[in-house]
């Protein structure tokens, strides 16, 4: 590799000696590759159009013969062939470079970025091409592209060198184009419904809005520990208190947690809050939002995912957590009187009981995660959660011990989370103080009491429905991607081992 780099570096020096800058400033393009392919799709073989076009892109393949060369040029839109003829270049570039064809053969490589001008022709073999009259090497690449990138078994190398992955894999570029369309469609749908997006702080004095371990940083001037936000919830609720009735924020969230095919410490979510609404309203919003985005981006409500077809046509299935656990395990949590009876029933069903399980609510959730979650392939709203695992949700209006909360599961993954939001400041204080006690007892995912948030609630927050959607997981679904790292352009990875460490 170092020899190849040295050879290419020498070519860059030769270009400078010839008076050509190998790292150009600009190039005027008249068309993209895709535009030319569409515009001249009906051009017959052997014909040429006497209209000058200009294009730029990366050389992806080159075949050089005696007095003729064929390059494949790739820009963001696609590829097109370059037809490079010695005599034609010698005549058209005589004033610029009398040895234009020789220098083209000797000083260009696959991976270089080239600008060309010429006319469009279709070869006798039927390949649409640009018959080049003038070219310029716009960027001399020093690193060769991998010959068999598709066959690499080291998947992490694709993530580490995403720029190369994007160059050689058009389907990867399409994933990120689709991601951009998804986020744009989400924003458009919410704005059409009267919501506005307001940005909230990334650096926060108190971590809150979720149970998660935060990243901690330090502000030198204020001499203050700060947290990277683990949710946008508490600040968006302050906006509801302040008089905004429909707000959302789509942005980055940071949680100091593990890495897996479903989790990245830095991820994207959207949180939506609507005054005078409840979790039933949020279910309807979630259905219509995701269905509309799928139709706009995928073109269908029947979405293929890893060999399965996911039907996103509303209405989606609704079931309580207790109903789903009963169906999967035979355990009727609604009839259990105390934790001791619950543990006995769970053990009798052959489900391992975690050591730290202080109440029936957490035991129910444990059974759900063990036996139900992975089976929820088609869109399912799991509703009515235990109060013990939902510190920010309003008590259920007719079911003691439960809260008005749902989570949306698709392909066995949580995709959205929603509450009828807790607006009682006294109840909220009790729950946050219980969470703070958990933190003091060693729970790294629990948080301290956010006194300013409680003060905001004491000024009066209207009935509110809240919703959070994991954007990365939604993009995974709508791009048929098995790993979250496939839909994050630059995912966090473990440091690469040095050559000495690898040998050891």
From Swiss-Prot:
<dbReference type="InterPro" id="IPR004365">
    <property type="entry name" value="NA-bd_OB_tRNA"/>
</dbReference>
<keyword id="KW-0030">Aminoacyl-tRNA synthetase</keyword>
<keyword id="KW-0648">Protein biosynthesis</keyword>
<feature type="binding site">
    <location>
        <position position="414"/>
    </location>
    <ligand>
        <name>Mg(2+) 2</name>
    </ligand>
</feature>
<dbReference type="GO" id="GO:0004824">
    <property type="term" value="F:lysine-tRNA ligase activity"/>
</dbReference>
<dbReference type="InterPro" id="IPR044136">
    <property type="entry name" value="Lys-tRNA-ligase_II_N"/>
</dbReference>
<dbReference type="GO" id="GO:0005524">
    <property type="term" value="F:ATP binding"/>
</dbReference>
<keyword id="KW-0547">Nucleotide-binding</keyword>
<comment type="similarity">
    <text>Belongs to the class-II aminoacyl-tRNA synthetase family.</text>
</comment>
<keyword id="KW-0479">Metal-binding</keyword>
<dbReference type="GO" id="GO:0000287">
    <property type="term" value="F:magnesium ion binding"/>
</dbReference>
<keyword id="KW-0067">ATP-binding</keyword>
<keyword id="KW-0436">Ligase</keyword>
<dbReference type="GO" id="GO:0000049">
    <property type="term" value="F:tRNA binding"/>
</dbReference>
<dbReference type="InterPro" id="IPR006195">
    <property type="entry name" value="aa-tRNA-synth_II"/>
</dbReference>
<dbReference type="InterPro" id="IPR034762">
    <property type="entry name" value="Lys-tRNA-ligase_II_bac/euk"/>
</dbReference>
<feature type="binding site">
    <location>
        <position position="414"/>
    </location>
    <ligand>
        <name>Mg(2+) 1</name>
    </ligand>
</feature>
<comment type="subunit">
    <text>Homodimer.</text>
</comment>
<feature type="binding site">
    <location>
        <position position="407"/>
    </location>
    <ligand>
        <name>Mg(2+) 1</name>
    </ligand>
</feature>
<dbReference type="InterPro" id="IPR012340">
    <property type="entry name" value="NA-bd_OB-fold"/>
</dbReference>
<dbReference type="Pfam" id="PF00152">
    <property type="entry name" value="tRNA-synt_2"/>
</dbReference>
<protein>
    <recommendedName>
        <fullName>Lysine--tRNA ligase</fullName>
        <ecNumber>6.1.1.6</ecNumber>
    </recommendedName>
</protein>
<dbReference type="GO" id="GO:0005829">
    <property type="term" value="C:cytosol"/>
</dbReference>
<dbReference type="GO" id="GO:0006430">
    <property type="term" value="P:lysyl-tRNA aminoacylation"/>
</dbReference>
<dbReference type="InterPro" id="IPR004364">
    <property type="entry name" value="Aa-tRNA-synt_II"/>
</dbReference>
<keyword id="KW-0460">Magnesium</keyword>
<dbReference type="InterPro" id="IPR045864">
    <property type="entry name" value="aa-tRNA-synth_II/BPL/LPL"/>
</dbReference>
<dbReference type="Pfam" id="PF01336">
    <property type="entry name" value="tRNA_anti-codon"/>
</dbReference>
<keyword id="KW-0963">Cytoplasm</keyword>
<dbReference type="InterPro" id="IPR002313">
    <property type="entry name" value="Lys-tRNA-ligase_II"/>
</dbReference>
<dbReference type="InterPro" id="IPR018149">
    <property type="entry name" value="Lys-tRNA-synth_II_C"/>
</dbReference>
């Amino acid at each position: 590799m170092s020899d190849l780099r040295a050879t290419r570096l020498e070519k860059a020096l030769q270009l400078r000696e010839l008076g050509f800058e190998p790292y150009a400033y600009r190039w005027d393009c008249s068309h993209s590759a895709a535009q030319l392919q569409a515009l001249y799709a009906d051009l017959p073989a052997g014909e040429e159009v006497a209209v000058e076009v200009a294009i730029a892109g990366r050389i992806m393949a080159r075949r050089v013969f005696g007095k003729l060369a064929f390059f494949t040029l790739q820009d963001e839109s696609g590829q097109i062939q370059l037809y490079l003829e010695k005599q034609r270049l010698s005549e058209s570039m005589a004033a610029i470079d009398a040895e234009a064809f020789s220098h083209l053969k000797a000083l260009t490589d696959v991976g270089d970025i080239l600008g060309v001008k010429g006319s469009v022709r279709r070869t006798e073999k039927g390949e649409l091409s640009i018959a080049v009259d003038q070219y310029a090497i716009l960027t001399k690449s020093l690193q060769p592209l991998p010959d068999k990138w598709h066959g690499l078994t080291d998947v992490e190398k694709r993530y580490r060198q995403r720029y190369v992955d994007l160059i050689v894999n058009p389907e990867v570029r399409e994933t990120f184009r689709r991601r951009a369309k998804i986020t744009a469609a989400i924003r458009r749908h919410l704005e059409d419904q009267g919501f506005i997006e307001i940005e909230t702080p990334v650096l926060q004095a108190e971590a809150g809005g979720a149970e998660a371990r935060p990243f901690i940083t330090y502000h030198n001037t204020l001499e203050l520990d700060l947290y990277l936000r683990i949710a946008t919830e508490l600040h968006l609720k302050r906006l509801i208190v302040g008089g905004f009735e429909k707000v959302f924020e789509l942005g980055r969230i940071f949680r100091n947690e593990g890495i897996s095919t479903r989790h990245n410490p830095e991820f994207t979510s959207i949180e939506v809050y609507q005054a005078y609404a409840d979790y039933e309203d949020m279910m309807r919003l979630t259905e219509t939002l995701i269905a509309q985005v799928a139709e706009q981006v995928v073109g269908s409500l029947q979405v293929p995912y890893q060999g399965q077809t996911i039907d996103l046509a509303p209405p989606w299935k609704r079931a309580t957590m207790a109903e789903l656990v009963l169906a999967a395990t035979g355990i009727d949590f609604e009839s259990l009187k105390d934790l001791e009876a619950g543990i006995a029933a769970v053990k009798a069903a052959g489900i391992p009981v975690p050591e730290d399980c202080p109440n029936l609510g957490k035991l129910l959730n444990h059974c759900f995660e063990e036996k139900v979650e992975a089976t929820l392939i088609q869109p399912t709203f799991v509703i009515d959660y235990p109060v013990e695992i939902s510190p920010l949700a309003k008590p259920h209006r007719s079911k003691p011990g439960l809260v008005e909360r749902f989570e949306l599961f698709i392909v066995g993954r949580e995709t959205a989370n929603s509450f009828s939001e807790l607006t009682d400041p006294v109840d909220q204080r009790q729950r946050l103080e219980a969470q703070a006690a958990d933190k003091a007892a060693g729970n790294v995912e629990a948080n301290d009491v956010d006194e300013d948030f409680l003060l905001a609630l004491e000024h009066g927050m209207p009935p509110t429905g809240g919703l959070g959607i994991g954007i990365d997981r939604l993009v995974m679904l709508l791009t048929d991607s098995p790993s979250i790292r496939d839909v994050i352009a630059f995912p966090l990875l473990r440091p690469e081992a040095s050559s000495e460490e690898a040998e050891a």
